[in-house]
């Protein structure tokens, strides 16, 4: 999966939030067992897409009556899953957000590619982490996302 992601720690729920960033979502269909989801039809996005709201970093399809493309994609692909290994991952990424020494970007990419998805699918524990994968969504973001830690997962 090639995507530019924003990582933010939600300290209230002790979970890590991952979301796409940039002028527009650049999600592509995923190869392999997850398959691909075709882009959402333009009619799924209402004319009044809620740009007046103070929500930051959400694509305009987030205000669709049928829900955002990402949510539809992840629901279809069962990607709202549990986290098993490295319970300190949210704290590690939060340290990177603060500019403190932690995992390197390369280590993070390897972690996501080689560990996380397998563990989410095959194992499971109580701590929950929602991941929204923009599979084919081409809707522009309402406004620029808040500053946070970026990395590219190749």
Swiss-Prot record:
It is found in: Host cytoplasm; Host nucleus; Host mitochondrion. Residues 68-117 are annotated as: Mitochondrial targeting sequence. GO terms for cellular component: host cell mitochondrion; host cell nucleus. Signal peptide: none annotated. The keyword Transcription regulation applies. InterPro entries: Transactivation_prot_X. Multifunctional protein that plays a role in silencing host antiviral defenses and promoting viral transcription. Does not seem to be essential for HBV infection. May be directly involved in development of cirrhosis and liver cancer (hepatocellular carcinoma). Most of cytosolic activities involve modulation of cytosolic calcium. The effect on apoptosis is controversial depending on the cell types in which the studies have been conducted. May induce apoptosis by localizing in mitochondria and causing loss of mitochondrial membrane potential. Belongs to the orthohepadnavirus protein X family. This is Protein X. It comes from Hepatitis B virus genotype B1 (isolate Japan/Ry30/2002) (HBV-B).
